[in-house]
C-alpha cells in the first residue's frame, strides 16, 4: 500500500548532506559531445554520475537488458538501470572556496546579517571582497581605538594594522626635503615645500638624488700682520677677529714661486710652488684681498694681499693652535686651520647610496654603489655624508631602536612589548609590531602592526558562524529584551527569533554557506537537438557551466600560488557564479544569454512566479483526456447535456472505445483497433454506435477560462453531434459567463468511477442551479426566453372608451360592437370594474381559451374570464398558457398555480423567483425540467412574437424640449449669481451638475411614461421592462438625452450631451462622449487584472477554511441589525430587504426570538420565509437585531462548524461537513470583482482634491487593511463633544469623567458631530473612511469585523451585486486571526511576536493550569496578502508570493507543514481534505441495518475475547451532505 504523506518538513542542508545526495562530482563544464551526441565524462550530463540515457544499457553498450540491473560496467563505469533515474539523481560541484547562499544574504532582513549583527551592506562588503571582517583582533588598536571582533576594515585599514601604517610622499625633481632622513615628524609638518605629512612617524628618504659629503680639511698656514693690530689668542673660533688694522696693510711674499690660489668662501689660501714642491702656505683671513692671481710667479717681497679694517677667521673655520713669532713691529703667525669642505655628487636612479644620513667616512670609503665602477662615489677624505633631494619621503609609524652589537631579530619578525631586539637584551620593543632591521642606519625599526586575523569572503563569514554559541547569544538577547528602548527591544526580538529558529530546528548557521553546490538531475535541465543540428538547452546548464569554469580556474590559480589580488577577484567571481545559479539577478545585473537581453532562468526563477514550478506545474497542470473547441448554442439540449463533436469524443474516450471494440470483435486486438481509428475513413457506423455505448452514462467536465468561481467547471452528459463545435445549453451561459461570439471551452474526462460519480453528483449542471455567493438561481431564464414569456404574459391596456359606465353587460357589449369601447379598455358595469373582453369571452376551461387564440378570435394579451383549476379567473390566455407550461414541466398544475403570480407579466425577477421557489419546493430534478420547459417555450414564443427593433422604435417624448428650455433658464440664473459674486466657482459647478442631473432624470421619466401610456408593446420598452436586454440608462440615451459625461480624471463635464442617439450627436457632443468611452475601456482592462489578483489573494488566505465539525459549541454570536442610520436625515430606518437577506438568510439563530406571537427557537436555520417574518416584526417595532451564529465567532480551528456557517447557499440546506467554504467565499467575493467600477470620485464641496475611493480599489483597500487616503478622525474614548474654533484650526475635545482628549483639525474639516453630542469610542468625528487599525485600537475586533463587512458590502451593493455577508466574514476572520504579544508572562514567547490567536489561547490555558502567568496580547488586523504569507503552511505561503523569503524563513526554522489546507495537498498530489477527499467522507462507511447488526455482534465477540487491538477505523453513520 502506498504510504501517505502526513507532514512535509523543510530544513537547511549541511555540506555532508549535499554530498550524500550526490552520485558524483561534476568536474568539467562539458555537456555532450557534438559528434557522438553522448554525454562527456565528468561533465554536466555524465552517465556515470546521473545514470544511463537508455533503459538498462550502459554507455559503451557492453551490458544491455534488464537482467544486468544494478551492475556497474567495468569499462565505462555506468550503472545498468532505468533511465528515469536521470530525473532524480543529483551531482555536486565541490567549491574551491566556500560561497554564501544568496537567499540567506539578500533576504530582508538578511538571516546571516541578523545572526552576526551585521547590516546587509556590511555583509555584502565582506562577501564580495570589498572589506575585511575581523575574526580575532589580537589586541590591535586603530587610531587609538581598540579593534573589535566582527569589525569591518577597509583594505587600507587592514594593511595598516597588519603591516603597519606608512605613507609615501613623492617630491618633484630638484626639490630638497625640509626634514632629515630618520627624523621624527608629526601630522601636519612640512616635509618639503608644499608637501605636508598626514601622519606621525619616522621620515625615511627613498632614493636621494644628490649626496653632499662635508670633507674635513686641515692645513698649517702662515700669516704676517702688524703686531699692534694683532688680537692675541691661543686659538680662534669661527669668525673671531685676528687683527684690527688701523690703516691698509700689504702682506708680502716671503718665498718666491708660482701662485696657487684657493678660495675659502670668506678667505683664501695661497700656495707657492717651486716645481712640484709647495714652499710656502699663506692664509688670507676675511678682510684681506688677494693681489695675485692663479699661476702668477711672485718674487720674495712682492705684495700678495692687502688688508683693511678687521681681519677675521672665516665662519666655517677654526684655528686650533697658533704659533706666534714677533719680528719687530710685525708678528709671524703659524695657524693650524680646520674646516669642512662640502662636495655634491649627483645620484642617478640606477645608483644606490649605501651609507646613512650623517655617516662619517674615511678616505677611500665607498659612498654610492653603481653597476659601473666608473660611476661609484668614493670618499676623497675623512668627512660626513648628507643626503639630499629624495625622490620620495616615506613616513612610517614605527619606533626606532639604534643598536651597537648583535641584532637578535630578523626583518619580518613580529614582536610584542618586552621582546628583545638587540645588544644581548639591552634593546627591547615597547610595542606590537613588525621588525625591520636597517643595517645601513644601524637601527631596528619596529613598525607598529598586529598579527590580526581578518579575512574576506564567505570563508570569513563561515568561520564566524561556526564560532557562534547560540545558547549564549539567546541569553544575551533575552537580557537585551529588558532594555527600556523600544527600538533596541525590537531589534533584539528579530535576532532572537532567528536564533531560536536555529536552536529549535537543529540547523547550524554555517550551513547557510555552501562548500558544495548540488547539481540538478540532467533530465530536469535537458538539452535537446533542434532543427538544423543546433541544441536548445535549459538556462541552468549555462549557469552551471559558468560556475564550473570559474571554480576550476580558481583551483588552478590557488595551486599556482597566484597573487592575492587575482585570487581575491576570482573568489568574488565564484561567489557571483553561485549566486547566479541560485538566484540570477538578485544582486547586481543578471547574467544574460550572449547577444540577448533575456536574463537566464536560475533555480529561484524556476520555483517562483506565475511560470514557476509551484504555480505552473504543481497547482495547475495540463491534463490528459482533454480537448478544447469553440462553443455554439445548443437550444435543443437538456440542462444536464452538452453537445460533443464526434471526432473529439472519439479521441477523448479512445481507451474505453478500444476496449469496447475488442469486446465486440470489431478488431482482433487493441493495436488493430487503434490502427483502425487512426485511418479515419475506416471508421464504420458500428464504431460510432460503440462510441455511443461508451459515453452512455458518462459525464464530461466543461470549463471556460477564466474560471472565476466553481461554476466555471461543470459536468454534462455528452451528446454526440456533427461538426467541430461544442454545443452548450443556453441557461448555463451565465454561470460560465459565456457567450457565442467565438468563446472556447475545454472538455475533460473524469476517468475513474469515483471521479465520474463525484462529477455526476456534485458538478452536474442540473445540480448547480443556485449561486454559492448569494443563494439565488444562476440558471434562470434570460434574454430571448424572458422576452417570449413576458410577451405572452403581458396584458393589453387600451384607451378607447376607458372609464365608461354601463348598467348591464349587454350594454357594454353593444357599445363594443359599435366600436365605442376597445376590448381591453377598463370600464364600469353595474358598479364593478371590468372590461369588454372579460364579459364577451368566458371560457369553461383553459383549452377553450387557447383554441380561441388559435382561431384568431383573441390575442394572447387580451384579458378574458376562464375557469381554471376550479377557480374563476380574469386573466389573459397568455398567462393561462404560461401556467400550463409550468404545470406540465413540474407535473402538477396545482403546485404551478401556487408558484406563479398570475396577475403580473413574467419579467426577469418574477421568473427568477419562480425558479427559486420551484427549487425549494420541488427539488433539483423538477427545477431542471422547469428550466428546460421555460427555455423551449421562451425561445419559441420570442420567435413567433416577431419582436424586432427599427429606428422608429426609439420614440422621443414631446416634453424633452420643454425640460431643456427650463434647464437653460435655470442655468442662466446660476451664471448670473456667479458673476455677481454670490457663488464660488465650486458652488457654481456643483449647482450646474445638480441641474443637469435632475433634468436628465426628468427626461428619462418622460421617455418611460411616453412608452407606458402610448406604446406599451414598443420592442425597446418591452425589452427593457422585461429585463431581457438593456436598462433604463440605455433607453434614455437612445430616446431621451445622453446627459452628463465623465472626464478622464473622473470628474464630470458640466456641459451635458443634450442629444439622444436617435437624434444624433453634434461634433462637440461626440468629442465629449469619447472621453468616457475610452476611460471605460481602460478601466475594464485594469479592473480585470486587479480583480483576478484579488481573487487569488482571497483564495490563498481562506483555502484552509473547511467545515470540519457539526457544532463548535460556542456561545458567542453576532447581532445582525435590521435598522441603519440614514446618511442624510441621521435617523434610524429599516435596512433594505435584500441587505437583510444577505445578512440573515441561511444562518443559525443563536438566541430564541419571539415576535408577532411567533417563536423562532435557538439553533433554527433561518429560511427565506423566516427572514421575511423577521422583517415584518422589525416593521412592527418588535425586533431591532437578530442574534445569529457566524464564522467570525466560530471556535473550530482551521475551519468552521456547520452551525456557525449555516446554509450551503448553492443547495439551500445546511452545509455538509467537508465543504471547502473558504474557497467558495473567496470566489464569491472575487468573481463579481470585474463588475465593480474603478472610479475614484472627486467629491464636490469644501474638501476639494480629497478622493473618495470606491469600487474595486475600495474593496482591495479594505481587504488589504490599508490606511485610507482621506481618513476620518475617530474618537478614542466615550464622551461629550466640545468644539473650539481657533484662527486657522478647529479643536474638538471629547470629554468624559476627569479625562479629555483633544483632536486638532483643519478649519475646513467636515465635522459629523455638533457641540454637546455624545460620542462613543470608534465613532468618526469627521467625514472620510475610517482607518480600520485605529478602530481596532479604539473599539476592539468586533467593531472592525462589522465595519469591514459593511464597507465591503456597500461597494458590492452599489453595483447591484448580491453577496452573502458570511463569505466576507470568513475572509475577515482570517484577517483577524493573528495577535501580537504585549507581555510574554511565563512563556517562551517574546514581546512583539506575532502568532495565531489559537496558539496563544491554548498556551494560556496550559500556563494557567500550571499556575503560571499567562501571555498578554492584543489583536492584530492583517491584510489578506500578509495574512496569507503568515500562514503556518510554508508550502501554501511559498506558492502564493515571495517564494524565496517564505522558503528561507521556513528552512532556518525547520518548519513542518501539517497539510491542513487545500493548496498544500494539491501541491503534493494528495486528495484535498475537503468534499469527498475529507477524512470524514473517506472513512465513513455507509451501512444498512443488517450490517449494523453484524458489526454489533462482532463487537460483542471482540469484547468477550478481550482482544487488545482496537478497530482501525471508527464506523460512523453518514451525515446528510454532498459527500459520496
UniProtKB/Swiss-Prot annotation:
<keyword id="KW-0240">DNA-directed RNA polymerase</keyword>
<dbReference type="Pfam" id="PF04983">
    <property type="entry name" value="RNA_pol_Rpb1_3"/>
</dbReference>
<protein>
    <recommendedName>
        <fullName>DNA-directed RNA polymerase subunit beta'</fullName>
        <ecNumber>2.7.7.6</ecNumber>
    </recommendedName>
</protein>
<dbReference type="InterPro" id="IPR007080">
    <property type="entry name" value="RNA_pol_Rpb1_1"/>
</dbReference>
<feature type="region of interest" description="Disordered">
    <location>
        <begin position="1502"/>
        <end position="1524"/>
    </location>
</feature>
<dbReference type="GO" id="GO:0008270">
    <property type="term" value="F:zinc ion binding"/>
</dbReference>
<comment type="function">
    <text>DNA-dependent RNA polymerase catalyzes the transcription of DNA into RNA using the four ribonucleoside triphosphates as substrates.</text>
</comment>
<keyword id="KW-0460">Magnesium</keyword>
<feature type="binding site">
    <location>
        <position position="1194"/>
    </location>
    <ligand>
        <name>Zn(2+) 2</name>
    </ligand>
</feature>
<dbReference type="GO" id="GO:0003677">
    <property type="term" value="F:DNA binding"/>
</dbReference>
<dbReference type="InterPro" id="IPR048566">
    <property type="entry name" value="RpoC_hybrid"/>
</dbReference>
<dbReference type="InterPro" id="IPR007083">
    <property type="entry name" value="RNA_pol_Rpb1_4"/>
</dbReference>
<feature type="binding site">
    <location>
        <position position="741"/>
    </location>
    <ligand>
        <name>Mg(2+)</name>
    </ligand>
</feature>
<dbReference type="Pfam" id="PF21668">
    <property type="entry name" value="RPOC_hybrid"/>
</dbReference>
<keyword id="KW-0804">Transcription</keyword>
<feature type="binding site">
    <location>
        <position position="60"/>
    </location>
    <ligand>
        <name>Zn(2+) 1</name>
    </ligand>
</feature>
<feature type="binding site">
    <location>
        <position position="1204"/>
    </location>
    <ligand>
        <name>Zn(2+) 2</name>
    </ligand>
</feature>
<feature type="binding site">
    <location>
        <position position="73"/>
    </location>
    <ligand>
        <name>Zn(2+) 1</name>
    </ligand>
</feature>
<dbReference type="InterPro" id="IPR006592">
    <property type="entry name" value="RNA_pol_N"/>
</dbReference>
<keyword id="KW-0808">Transferase</keyword>
<feature type="binding site">
    <location>
        <position position="739"/>
    </location>
    <ligand>
        <name>Mg(2+)</name>
    </ligand>
</feature>
<dbReference type="GO" id="GO:0000428">
    <property type="term" value="C:DNA-directed RNA polymerase complex"/>
</dbReference>
<dbReference type="InterPro" id="IPR000722">
    <property type="entry name" value="RNA_pol_asu"/>
</dbReference>
<feature type="binding site">
    <location>
        <position position="1112"/>
    </location>
    <ligand>
        <name>Zn(2+) 2</name>
    </ligand>
</feature>
<dbReference type="InterPro" id="IPR045867">
    <property type="entry name" value="DNA-dir_RpoC_beta_prime"/>
</dbReference>
<dbReference type="InterPro" id="IPR044893">
    <property type="entry name" value="RNA_pol_Rpb1_clamp_domain"/>
</dbReference>
<feature type="binding site">
    <location>
        <position position="58"/>
    </location>
    <ligand>
        <name>Zn(2+) 1</name>
    </ligand>
</feature>
<dbReference type="Pfam" id="PF04998">
    <property type="entry name" value="RNA_pol_Rpb1_5"/>
</dbReference>
<keyword id="KW-0548">Nucleotidyltransferase</keyword>
<keyword id="KW-0479">Metal-binding</keyword>
<dbReference type="InterPro" id="IPR042102">
    <property type="entry name" value="RNA_pol_Rpb1_3_sf"/>
</dbReference>
<feature type="binding site">
    <location>
        <position position="76"/>
    </location>
    <ligand>
        <name>Zn(2+) 1</name>
    </ligand>
</feature>
<dbReference type="GO" id="GO:0006351">
    <property type="term" value="P:DNA-templated transcription"/>
</dbReference>
<feature type="binding site">
    <location>
        <position position="743"/>
    </location>
    <ligand>
        <name>Mg(2+)</name>
    </ligand>
</feature>
<dbReference type="GO" id="GO:0000287">
    <property type="term" value="F:magnesium ion binding"/>
</dbReference>
<dbReference type="InterPro" id="IPR007066">
    <property type="entry name" value="RNA_pol_Rpb1_3"/>
</dbReference>
<comment type="subunit">
    <text>The RNAP catalytic core consists of 2 alpha, 1 beta, 1 beta' and 1 omega subunit. When a sigma factor is associated with the core the holoenzyme is formed, which can initiate transcription.</text>
</comment>
<feature type="binding site">
    <location>
        <position position="1201"/>
    </location>
    <ligand>
        <name>Zn(2+) 2</name>
    </ligand>
</feature>
<dbReference type="Pfam" id="PF04997">
    <property type="entry name" value="RNA_pol_Rpb1_1"/>
</dbReference>
<dbReference type="InterPro" id="IPR012754">
    <property type="entry name" value="DNA-dir_RpoC_beta_prime_bact"/>
</dbReference>
<dbReference type="Pfam" id="PF05000">
    <property type="entry name" value="RNA_pol_Rpb1_4"/>
</dbReference>
<dbReference type="GO" id="GO:0003899">
    <property type="term" value="F:DNA-directed RNA polymerase activity"/>
</dbReference>
Amino acid at each position: 500500500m502506498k504510504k501517505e504523506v502526513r507532514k512535509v518538513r523543510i530544513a537547511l542542508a549541511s555540506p555532508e548532506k549535499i554530498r550524500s545526495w550526490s552520485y558524483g562530482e561534476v568536474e568539467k563544464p562539458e555537456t555532450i559531445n557534438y559528434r557522438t551526441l553522448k554525454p562527456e565524462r565528468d561533465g554536466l550530463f555524465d552517465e556515470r554520475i546521473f545514470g544511463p540515457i537508455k533503459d538498462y544499457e550502459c554507455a559503451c553498450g557492453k551490458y544491455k537488458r534488464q537482467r544486468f540491473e544494478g551492475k556497474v560496467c567495468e569499462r565505462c563505469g555506468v550503472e545498468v538501470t532505468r533511465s528515469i533515474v536521470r530525473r532524480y539523481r543529483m551531482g555536486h560541484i565541490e567549491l574551491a572556496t566556500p560561497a554564501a547562499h544568496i537567499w540567506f544574504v539578500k533576504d530582508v532582513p538578511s538571516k546571516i546579517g541578523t545572526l552576526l549583527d551585521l547590516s546587509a551592506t556590511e555583509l555584502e562588503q565582506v562577501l564580495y571582497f570589498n572589506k575585511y571582517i575581523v575574526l580575532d583582533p589580537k589586541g590591535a588598536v586603530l587610531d587609538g581605538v581598540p579593534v573589535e571582533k566582527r569589525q569591518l576594515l577597509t583594505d587600507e585599514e587592514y594593511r595598516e594594522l597588519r603591516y603597519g601604517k606608512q605613507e609615501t610622499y613623492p617630491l618633484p625633481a630638484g626639490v630638497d626635503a625640509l626634514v632629515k632622513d630618520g627624523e621624527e615628524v608629526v601630522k601636519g609638518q612640512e616635509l618639503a615645500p608644499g608637501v605636508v605629512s598626514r601622519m606621525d612617524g619616522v621620515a625615511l628618504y627613498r632614493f636621494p638624488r644628490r649626496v653632499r659629503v662635508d670633507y674635513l680639511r686641515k692645513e698649517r698656514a702662515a700669516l704676517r700682520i702688524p703686531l699692534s693690530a694683532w688680537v692675541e689668542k691661543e686659538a680662534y673660533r669661527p669668525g673671531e677677529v685676528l687683527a684690527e688694522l688701523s690703516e691698509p696693510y700689504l702682506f708680502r711674499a716671503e718665498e718666491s714661486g708660482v701662485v696657487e690660489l684657493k678660495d675659502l668662501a670668506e678667505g683664501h689660501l695661497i700656495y707657492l710652488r717651486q716645481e712640484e714642491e709647495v714652499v710656502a702656505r699663506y692664509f688670507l683671513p676675511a678682510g684681506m684681498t688677494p693681489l695675485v692671481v692663479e699661476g702668477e710667479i711672485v718674487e720674495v717681497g712682492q705684495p700678495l694681499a692687502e688688508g683693511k679694517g678687521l681681519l677675521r677667521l672665516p665662519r666655517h673655520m677654526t684655528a686650533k693652535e697658533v704659533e706666534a713669532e714677533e719680528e719687530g713691529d710685525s708678528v709671524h703667525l703659524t695657524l693650524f686651520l680646520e674646516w669642512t669642505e662640502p662636495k655634491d655628487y649627483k645620484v642617478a636612479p640606477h645608483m644606490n647610496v649605501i651609507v646613512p644620513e650623517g655617516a662619517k667616512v674615511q678616505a677611500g670609503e665607498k659612498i654610492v654603489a653603481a653597476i659601473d665602477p666608473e660611476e661609484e662615489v668614493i670618499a676623497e677624505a675623512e668627512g660626513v655624508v648628507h643626503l639630499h633631494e629624495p625622490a620620495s619621503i616615506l613616513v612610517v609609524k614605527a619606533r626606532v631602536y639604534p643598536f651597537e652589537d648583535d641584532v637578535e631579530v630578523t626583518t619580518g619578525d613580529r614582536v610584542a612589548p618586552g621582546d628583545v631586539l638587540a645588544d644581548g637584551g639591552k634593546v627591547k620593543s615597547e610595542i606590537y609590531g613588525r621588525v625591520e632591521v636597517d643595517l645601513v642606519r644601524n637601527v631596528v625599526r619596529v613598525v607598529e602592526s598586529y598579527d590580526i586575523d581578518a579575512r574576506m569572503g564567505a570563508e570569513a563569514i563561515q568561520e564566524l558562524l561556526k564560532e557562534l554559541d547560540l545558547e549564549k547569544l539567546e541569553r544575551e538577547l533575552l537580557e537585551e529584551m529588558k532594555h527600556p528602548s523600544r527600538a533596541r527591544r525590537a531589534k533584539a526580538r528579530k535576532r532572537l527569533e532567528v536564533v531560536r529558529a536555529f536552536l529549535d530546528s537543529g540547523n547550524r548557521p554555517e550551513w547557510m554557506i555552501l562548500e558544495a553546490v548540488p547539481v540538478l538531475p540532467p533530465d530536469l535541465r535537458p538539452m535537446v537537438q533542434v532543427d538544423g543540428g543546433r541544441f536548445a538547452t535549459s538556462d541552468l546548464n549555462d549557469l552551471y557551466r559558468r560556475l564550473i569554469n570559474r571554480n576550476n580556474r580558481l583551483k588552478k590559480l590557488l595551486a599556482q600560488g597566484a597573487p592575492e589580488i587575482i585570487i581575491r577577484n576570482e573568489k568574488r567571481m565564484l561567489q557571483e557564479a553561485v549566486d547566479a545559479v541560485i538566484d540570477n539577478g538578485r544582486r547586481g545585473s543578471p547574467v544574460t544569454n550572449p547577444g540577448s537581453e533575456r536574463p537566464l532562468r536560475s533555480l529561484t526563477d524556476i520555483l517562483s512566479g506565475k511560470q514557476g514550478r509551484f504555480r505552473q506545474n504543481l497547482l495547475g497542470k495540463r491534463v490528459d483526456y482533454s480537448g478544447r473547441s469553440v462553443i455554439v448554442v445548443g437550444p435543443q439540449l437538456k440542462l444536464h447535456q452538452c453537445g460533443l463533436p464526434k471526432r473529439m469524443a472519439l479521441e477523448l474516450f479512445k481507451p474505453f472505445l478500444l476496449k469496447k471494440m475488442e469486446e465486440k470483435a470489431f478488431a482482433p486486438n487493441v493495436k488493430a483497433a487503434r490502427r483502425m481509428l487512426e485511418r479515419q475513413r475506416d471508421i464504420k457506423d458500428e464504431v460510432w454506435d460503440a462510441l455511443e455505448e461508451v459515453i452512455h452514462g458518462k459525464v464530461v467536465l466543461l470549463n471556460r477560462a477564466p474560471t472565476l468561481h466553481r461554476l466555471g467547471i461543470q459536468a454534462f452528459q455528452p451528446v454526440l453531434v456533427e461538426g467541430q463545435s461544442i454545443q452548450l445549453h443556453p441557461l448555463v451561459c451565465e454561470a460560465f459567463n459565456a457567450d457565442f461570439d467565438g468563446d472556447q471551452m475545454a472538455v475533460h474526462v473524469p476517468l475513474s468511477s469515483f471521479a465520474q460519480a463525484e462529477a455526476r453528483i456534485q458538478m452536474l449542471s442540473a445540480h448547480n442551479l443556485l449561486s454559492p455567493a448569494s443563494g439565488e438561481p444562476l440558471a434562470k431564464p434570460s434574454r430571448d426566453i424572458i422576452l417570449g414569456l413576458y410577451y405572452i404574459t403581458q396584458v393589453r391596456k387600451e384607451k378607447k372608451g376607458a372609464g365608461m359606465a354601463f348598467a348591464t353587460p349587454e350594454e357594454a357589449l353593444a357599445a363594443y360592437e359599435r366600436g365605442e369601447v376597445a376590448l381591453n379598455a377598463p370600464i364600469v358595469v353595474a358598479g364593478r370594474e371590468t372590461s369588454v373582453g372579460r364579459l364577451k369571452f368566458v371560457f369553461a376551461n383553459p383549452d377553450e381559451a387557447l383554441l380561441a387564440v388559435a382561431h384568431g378570435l383573441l390575442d394572447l394579451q387580451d384579458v378574458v374570464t376562464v375557469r381554471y383549476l376550479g377557480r374563476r379567473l380574469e386573466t389573459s390566455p397568455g398567462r393561462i398558457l404560461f401556467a400550463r407550461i409550468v404545470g406540465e414541466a413540474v407535473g402538477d398544475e396545482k403546485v404551478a398555480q401556487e408558484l406563479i403570480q398570475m396577475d403580473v407579466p413574467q419579467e426577469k425577477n418574477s421568473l427568477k423567483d419562480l425558479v427559486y421557489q420551484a427549487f425549494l419546493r420541488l427539488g433539483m430534478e423538477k427545477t431542471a425540467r422547469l428550466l428546460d420547459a421555460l427555455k423551449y417555450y421562451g425561445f419559441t414564443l420570442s420567435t413567433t412574437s416577431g419582436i424586432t427593433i427599427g429606428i422608429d422604435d426609439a420614440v422621443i417624448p414631446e416634453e424633452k424640449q420643454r425640460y431643456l428650455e427650463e434647464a437653460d433658464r435655470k442655468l442662466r440664473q446660476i451664471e448670473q449669481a456667479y458673476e455677481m459674486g454670490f457663488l464660488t466657482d465650486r458652488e457654481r459647478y456643483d449647482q450646474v451638475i445638480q441641474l443637469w442631473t435632475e433634468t436628465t432624470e426628468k427626461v428619462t421619466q418622460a421617455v418611460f411614461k411616453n412608452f407606458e401610456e402610448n406604446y406599451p408593446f414598443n420592442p425597446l420598452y418591452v425589452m427593457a421592462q422585461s429585463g431581457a436586454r438593456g436598462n433604463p440608462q440605455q433607453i434614455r440615451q437612445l430616446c431621451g438625452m445622453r446627459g452628463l459625461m465623465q472626464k478622464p480624471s473622473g470628474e464630470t463635464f458640466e456641459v451635458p450631451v443634450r442629444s439622444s442617439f436617435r437624434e444624433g450627436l453634434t461634433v462637440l457632443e461626440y468629442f465629449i462622449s469619447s472621453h468616457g468611452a475610452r476611460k471605460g475601456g481602460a478601466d475594464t482592462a485594469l479592473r480585470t487584472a486587479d480583480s483576478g489578483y484579488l481573487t487569488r489573494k482571497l483564495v490563498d488566505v481562506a483555502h484552509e477554511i473547511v467545515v470540519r465539525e457539526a457544532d463548535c459549541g460556542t456561545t458567542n454570536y453576532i447581532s445582525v441589525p435590521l435598522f441603519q442610520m440614514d446618511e442624510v436625515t441621521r435617523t434610524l430606518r429599516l435596512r433594505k430587504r435584500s441587505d437583510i437577506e444577505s445578512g440573515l438568510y441561511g444562518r443559525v439563530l443563536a438566541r430564541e426570538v419571539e415576535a408577532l406571537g411567533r417563536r423562532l427557537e435557538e439553533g433554527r436555520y433561518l429560511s427565506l420565509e423566516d427572514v421575511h417574518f423577521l422583517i415584518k416584526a422589525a416593521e412592527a417595532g418588535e425586533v431591532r437585531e437578530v442574534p445569529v451564529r457566524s464564522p467570525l465567532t466560530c471556535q473550530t480551528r482551521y475551519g468552521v462548524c456547520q452551525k456557525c456557517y449555516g446554509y450551503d447557499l448553492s443547495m439551500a440546506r445546511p452545509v455538509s461537513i467537508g465543504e471547502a467554504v473558504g474557497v467558495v467565499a473567496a470566489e464569491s467575493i472575487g468573481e463579481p470583482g470585474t463588475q465593480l467600477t474603478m472610479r475614484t470620485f472627486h467629491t464636490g464641496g469644501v474638501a476639494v482634491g480629497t478622493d473618495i475611493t470606491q469600487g474595486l480599489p475600495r474593496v482591495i483597500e479594505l481587504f488589504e487593511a490599508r490606511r485610507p487616503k482621506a481618513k476620518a478622525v475617530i474618537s478614542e474614548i466615550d464622551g461629550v463633544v466640545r468644539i473650539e474654533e481657533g484662527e486657522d484650526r478647529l479643536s474638538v475635545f471629547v470629554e468624559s469623567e476627569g479625562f479629555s482628549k483633544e483632536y486638532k483639525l483643519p478649519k475646513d474639516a467636515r465635522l459629523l458631530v455638533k457641540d454637546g453630542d455624545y460620542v462613543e469610542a470608534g465613532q468618526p468625528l469627521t467625514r472620510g473612511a475610517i482607518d480600520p487599525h485605529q478602530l481596532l485600537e479604539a473599539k476592539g475586533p468586533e467593531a472592525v469585523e462589522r465595519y469591514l463587512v459593511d464597507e465591503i458590502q456597500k461597494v458590492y451593493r452599489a453595483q447591484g451585486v448580491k453577496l452573502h455577508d458570511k463569505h466576507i466574514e470568513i475572509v475577515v476572520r482570517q484577517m483577524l486571526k493573528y495577535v501580537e504579544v504585549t507581555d510574554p508572562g511565563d512563556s517562551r514567547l517574546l514581546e512583539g511576536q506575532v502568532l495565531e490567536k489559537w496558539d496563544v489561547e491554548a498556551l494560556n490555558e496550559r500556563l494557567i493550569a500550571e499556575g503560571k502567568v499567562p501571555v498578554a496580547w492584543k489583536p492584530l488586523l492583517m491584510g489578506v496578502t500578509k495574512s496569507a504569507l503568515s500562514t503556518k503552511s510554508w508550502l501554501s505561503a511559498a506558492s502564493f508570493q515571495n517564494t524565496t523569503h517564505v522558503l528561507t524563513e521556513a528552512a532556518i526554522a525547520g518548519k513542518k507543514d501539517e497539510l491542513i489546507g487545500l493548496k498544500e495537498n494539491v501541491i503534493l498530489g494528495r486528495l484535498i481534505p475537503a468534499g469527498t477527499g475529507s477524512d470524514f467522507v473517506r472513512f465513513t462507511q455507509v451501512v444498512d441495518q443488517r450490517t449494523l447488526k453484524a458489526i454489533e455482534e462482532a463487537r460483542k465477540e471482540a469484547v468477550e475475547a478481550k482482544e487488545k487491538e482496537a478497530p482501525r477505523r471508527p464506523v460512523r453513520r453518514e451525515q446528510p451532505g454532498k459527500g459520496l
